[in-house]
């Protein structure tokens, strides 16, 4: 019998590009974009207060794992810039991991330590690690945006050859 689907919630800049790249990963069964980590209930694009633009990911743990998702997340956005990705500046575009349980928190903290130790980014990781709260689904026009507009705006790119080594003594 297959394992139950697991959930991950990540923020790393504009949600269009994050969704388009993460949705393609083996084991990812569904994605949706929205707002989380902030102060406004029923957040919308025009009124999302201090929320981050985020992506909710459902994945099959028999086909991929949380660590693999995080490694890809750290490859496709710059986790060393605070409240910014490319031309997008502001709290909405911060880097954050919203964990659903203590195991995800531990994996997130270990992965961040590995990213910092790797020297793959020019500065230390500023990614926030917070418990997941309400996730407000974005409007339909934001869902699957780059599927509908393949030449639309994105500041997220896979970096060929980017491989995250585990720190010496880490569980990786």
From Swiss-Prot:
Signal peptide: none annotated. The gene is msrA. This is Peptide methionine sulfoxide reductase MsrA. Keywords: Oxidoreductase. It holds the Pfam family PMSR. Its EC number is 1.8.4.11. One of its GO terms (biological process) is cellular response to oxidative stress. GO terms for molecular function: L-methionine-(S)-S-oxide reductase activity; peptide-methionine (S)-S-oxide reductase activity. It comes from the Bacteria. InterPro entries: Met_Sox_Rdtase_MsrA_dom, Met_Sox_Rdtase_MsrA_sf. GO terms for cellular component: cytoplasm. Belongs to the MsrA Met sulfoxide reductase family. The keyword Transcription regulation does not apply. It catalyses: L-methionyl-[protein] + [thioredoxin]-disulfide + H2O = L-methionyl-(S)-S-oxide-[protein] + [thioredoxin]-dithiol; [thioredoxin]-disulfide + L-methionine + H2O = L-methionine (S)-S-oxide + [thioredoxin]-dithiol. The active site is at 14. It is an enzyme of class 1 (oxidoreductase). Has an important function as a repair enzyme for proteins that have been inactivated by oxidation. Catalyzes the reversible oxidation-reduction of methionine sulfoxide in proteins to methionine.
């Amino acid at each position: 019998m297959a394992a139950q689907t697991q959930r991950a919630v990540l923020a790393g800049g504009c949600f269009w590009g994050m969704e388009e790249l993460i949705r393609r990963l083996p084991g990812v069964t569904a994605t949706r974009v929205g707002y989380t980590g902030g102060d406004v209930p029923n957040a919308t694009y025009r009124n999302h207060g201090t929320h981050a633009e985020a992506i909710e990911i459902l994945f099959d743990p028999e086909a991929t794992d949380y660590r693999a998702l995080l490694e890809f997340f750290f490859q496709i956005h710059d986790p060393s810039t605070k409240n910014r990705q490319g031309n997008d500046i502001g709290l909405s575009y911060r880097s954050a991991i919203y964990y659903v349980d203590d195991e995800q928190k531990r994996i997130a903290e270990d992965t961040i330590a590995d990213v910092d130790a790797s020297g793959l980014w020019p500065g230390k990781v500023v990614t926030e690690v917070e418990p997941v709260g309400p996730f407000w689904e974005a409007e339909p026009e934001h869902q699957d945006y780059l599927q509908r507009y393949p030449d639309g705006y994105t500041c997220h790119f896979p970096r060929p050859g980017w491989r995250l080594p585990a720190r010496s003594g880490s569980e990786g």
